[in-house]
């Protein structure tokens, strides 16, 4: 994912690298920085032409990282929904966006915590539901709600514990 320029710790680092590369290498280097960080290639062009002063913002940098990680993990279904929810949290809270961008924080580890919590909270479904689904009882399930996911995400990325 971060092959040429490495993983950046913040949107500021991305912007500093982009400014340095603009002076040295030009558009192709900026496009590589954008690609490695999940940023829009058009933003790279706009940055190079001076249409925008910075390549990225806190929320765009966080969402770009999440998108790259989700693609790398081939997330679909509920896990993709959870990723979208984390992106929404980044748009609502700059502190969250900054935390998601930090080195060492990963969507993989956050998803693992959500799944672990879900597994630990599993409950047996009523046998009538299980049978109506054509399955054999007993069946245990746990699907965390948004409030629970938000709590886990905030704890993982921000260190906040309720």
Language-model segments: which ranges?
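Helix N-terminus capping/helix-initiation residues
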Residues: 22-26, 93, 106, 145
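Long, highly charged low-complexity segments enriched in Glu/Asp and Lys/Arg with interspersed Ser/Thr
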Residues: 124-162
């Amino acid at each position: 994912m971060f092959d040429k320029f490495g993983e950046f710790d913040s949107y500021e680092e991305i912007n500093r690298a982009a400014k340095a590369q603009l002076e040295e290498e030009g558009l192709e280097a900026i496009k590589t920085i954008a690609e490695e960080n999940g940023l829009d290639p058009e933003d790279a062009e706009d940055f190079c032409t001076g249409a925008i002063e910075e390549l990225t913002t806190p929320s765009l940098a966080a969402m770009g990282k999440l998108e790259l990680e989700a693609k790398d993990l081939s997330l679909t279904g509920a896990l993709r929904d959870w990723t979208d929810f984390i992106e929404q949290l980044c748009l609502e809270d700059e502190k969250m966006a900054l935390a998601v961008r930090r080195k060492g924080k990963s969507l993989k580890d956050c998803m693992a915590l959500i799944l672990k919590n879900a597994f630990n909270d599993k409950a047996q479904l009523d046998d009538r539901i299980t049978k109506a689904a054509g399955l054999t009882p007993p069946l245990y399930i746990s699907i965390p709600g948004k409030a629970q996911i938000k709590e886990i995400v905030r704890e993982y990325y921000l260190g906040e514990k309720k």
